[in-house]
């Protein structure tokens, strides 16, 4: 079974208009941080004021951290959590 991070649609795959706060954590800590927000995943994101907070796993199943960053930043840019267009 291939392991990958879903690429966001082009219209959400761009720089965030505010401040981006990026936390790269060991996989276990990233999962715990996301679980505290009700997200059961390796990575997550949320908006806080004019900031986009990204929780990115280090040592996770996908080694390309930029793939996680693109995916999670897209959620701050309006991509729905169910990944619909």
What kind of region is each of these model predictions?
Residues 74, 78:
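Short active-site segment of divalent metal-dependent hydrolases/proteases
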Residues 1-22:
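N-terminal low-complexity, Pro/Thr/Ser-rich intrinsically disordered segments
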